[in-house]
Amino acid sequence: MNYSWITIMSLLVICKLASAKVVLIGKNTILSFDDVEATFTPIVRNSGECGILYVAEPLEACSDITNMAEKRSKYRSSYVLIVLGGCSFEEKVRKAQKAGYKAAIVYNDGYDELLVPMAGNSSGVDIHGLLVTRASGEVLKGYADQDEMKLWLIPGFGISSWSIMGITFISLLAMSAILATCFVVRRHQIRQSVRDLPHGGQGLSCMPRDLLQSMPTEVYSGVLEESSTSVTCAICIDDYCVGEKLRILPCKHKYHAVCIDSWLGRCRSFCPVCKQNPRTGNDVPPASETTPLISPSPNSITSLQSFYDLPIVVRVYL
C-alpha cells in the first residue's frame, strides 16, 4: 500500500508531539519508539530521515559487519540494528559506518528502561547513533529486512538548561511589564480623580513664590513654646537645631523653611500635617496632641495624596 506524503507528514507531526524519534510505518502498522541520540554523532535533521532497517551480522557488531548496506536512493537510506554489549557504543557506530549504513540503532542488552546519551569520539563519525530499550529493539527486529516497512528518524524536542532559563526570563519580564502597566494605570486614575475634585482639586496647585515668602518665619531657639506640638520637622523627620530658620503656616504648624518651601513649591499647596490649604482663610484652631492628621475640610485631599509625592530634602551642615 502506498502512503501519500500528506499522510506521512501528519504522522510525523503526531510523533513529534509525542516526542517519539523512531517511527516504524508499514501496511496497517504504525509504531513509535523513544530513543536518545549519542552525543558524538550528527543529530537528525529537522525534516526527519527515512530508511529500511536491517539486523547486523554479527548482532553485537564488535567485528566487521558482513551484511553490507544496499545502495538506495537519496530519499531512503539503510539503517542497522545492533545489540549493546561486547564493545563500546562508539565502536559499533564505526562498524556500521564502515559497512555503509546511515544510522546505527543500538538497543539495550538488559531490561533497563533508562536511556542515557552515549559519549564517544566524534572524529570521523558521519552517521547517526541512537539508543533504544531492549523491548523496542526486539520489536524492531521483528520488522527488519522488509522493504515495505519504512523506518523514520525524527528529531525530538529536547529541553535544555538554556531553554529553561529563557522561559523563566521571559516569564519574569512579562510579569514585570504587567505590574508596571498596573502601576501606571492606577497612578493615572488617581491623578484623574484629583482633577475631578471640587474647585478643580484646589490645594494641589503650586503656591506663588511671593505668597510663600510672605509667610512668617522664626529662628529656632530650642525652647518649646506652649502652642508648639513637636520639635521635629514632619517633612524631613529631623529635629530642629538651635539657629535654624523655621517657616510658620497659617495653621500654626512649623517646618524647616527649606523643607516647606520645597513642599509648597512642588504643586502641593497644603500643610503636610493637617492638609489645610495655606492660601484659604479658614479659621483652624491651633494644633494640639488631639489634632487629626487629615482635616475634614472640603479642601482635604484625603487618601488621594500618595506617599511618593513627598519631596526629598537634603540638608548639608557646614
Curated annotation (Swiss-Prot):
Signal peptide, first to last residue: 1-20
Pfam families on file: PA, zf-RING_2
BP GO annotations: protein transport
Protein name: Receptor homology region, transmembrane domain- and RING domain-containing protein 5
Keyword Phosphoprotein: no
Main location (coarse class): membrane
Database matches in CDD domains: PA_C_RZF_like, RING-H2_RNF11
Disulfide bonds: C62-C87
Record's keyword terms, sorted: Disulfide bond, Glycoprotein, Membrane, Metal-binding, Protein transport, Signal, Transmembrane, Transmembrane helix, Transport, Vacuole, Zinc, Zinc-finger
Functional note: Involved in the trafficking of vacuolar proteins. May function as a sorting receptor for protein trafficking to the protein storage vacuole (PSV).
Glycosylation sites: N121
PROSITE patterns cross-referenced by the UniProt entry: ZF_RING_2
Domain PA: 70-143
Top-level taxon of the source organism: Eukaryota
